[in-house]
């Protein structure tokens, strides 16, 4: 608990500068790699302000990719009365998910998207060209030191080439088309040091499978990861892409590798190939017949390598994780969970029979992956009773694999080919797992029902292990793998240091003169009684039951009546009582209203935006938690519900009011929602302070993340749609 005197200069603990408790940054504040990239793309900042983890910022990304979901984004864009794109060079359309679907309905949808791209001059890649994430890297949209977003959860993929990639929702994509920008809260940043060197037969896929299994207690949940360490230089770029891609399954919102000489050499190879081709976009006349690629060219590469973006010495990280690569053996993820990772040797006895094997997806279907599988299967056949499906990450990858002879090797072994696209990875098309079947895949997700029947079992592994398993009919490694030569450790060596919880309270000077002014119309203070739901991982279904989700005619008043129904049936009545008893605001700049407090990962689960609007309609203008689910956060702020993170406040509330001093058991009084009698809470929007008035007890003030200017802009315009209309 931190008591902060009300002085012109405030003294707070050093840990309050972490992702959830920072007040502001000064010119001299060291920045991480992620913060530096965001700094380049943040717009509307006051002069001299440096962004930090926890800040809400308005971002103008280099590019935004949409895939088959471009159709709904077009509908949202048109519903905003938009007639033209803010910057036609910013969006990229790549059709990749349902490419096996030749139905009239799907083909009509694809043609509509292509026509929209042609009308507005947007780069368009048709079905069969490849998976969007592969294309974004392959065609140079993702680039070292840049920031690229996509309406797909595996946008983390771009971090493999030193590009900050993160996912957005469809409404954000429409907003970017219209205004060129979107809001983002810079996540807490975790450093992951990969040390040593992998043994022969161990791959980048084994690295990320092991990381997700070893650090499976939400250590990187909703964080941005920066990979460092001596082992990075020994990882191929394809391996880095695999690792970055699956940081999504690990729980992170981004995973970025450094820009180094190995990346430079890789791009030089790409450029040599590019010189042999002409560059034709089917929708952009300016590139037709061009001799120099608009993105993949020597001048651009020289600029990226000369002006490399690197973290500052002394930059702050919420945590530091490490993994000794030299102690790692091949690992398998599952069954049906990426949080379960087992060393391959432990799965050999008793053998695990399989029915299907897959070498598909943006995770592991590049030319090097196909070559690895071909090396295992050369001269062999897929085992009787096993179906082995292959699909290249892109048509260009398939061309390279065909030229090398690897594609034909897999076909000769009995592999069944699929078009370049997502296919079985997303549970679409032929070859899905059926009830009772077991599959092993080089993809990124093995959640129950993801690749077919919910009554099937799915494992994840490297391309070599998948190919070997297809040949043997059981999960195994290649014949060339000598288990006795692998590192002999019970488990890989790893460690974690939580910097944010270090507890060393060095005073930090915060100058009032450096505070940014609030936008006109945004409340300087939020004030009112508090409700505390002592629960972690409170789902959106708990906030707004699924049975109401598709009642499109439901009123705001009715939403308020059912809010939190699945968590606490009495919550709505409690909130109504507090709302009707609210006193007059203490000042014109104060917005009165009950304030909801809860635990960590508040709003996990379904993406239903009614979870946010129901809370707001219940008269709760602001929610304070330890952390929030990322999609819930976006839905809330897009609809004008303010969210603030203050771990220290939640810690004290838990100790005082939660049963047994821990969350997830309800309150000490037996109620699921605690309303401390006589207590009031006041949030200072500009300073990032939360003051709790405990009735007859002393006031306590806690650090919290400030309400950023980007969030203020949305709020004063009534939400994202109002902001977009005001920006046109």
Curated annotation (Swiss-Prot):
Species annotation: Cryptococcus neoformans var. neoformans serotype D (strain JEC21 / ATCC MYA-565) (Filobasidiella neoformans)
Cofactor(s) essential for the protein: [4Fe-4S] cluster
Enzyme class, first EC level, given as a word: lyase
Gene Ontology CC terms, in alphabetical order: mitochondrial matrix
Pathway(s) of this molecule: Amino-acid biosynthesis; L-lysine biosynthesis via AAA pathway; L-alpha-aminoadipate from 2-oxoglutarate: step 3/5
Note describing how the cofactor binds: Binds 1 [4Fe-4S] cluster per subunit.
Catalytic activity, as annotated: (2R,3S)-homoisocitrate = cis-homoaconitate + H2O
Pfam families according to UniProt: Aconitase, Aconitase_C
Subcellular location: Mitochondrion
Protein's job: Catalyzes the reversible hydration of cis-homoaconitate to (2R,3S)-homoisocitrate, a step in the alpha-aminoadipate pathway for lysine biosynthesis.
UniProt protein name: Homoaconitase, mitochondrial
Any one GO molecular function term: metal ion binding
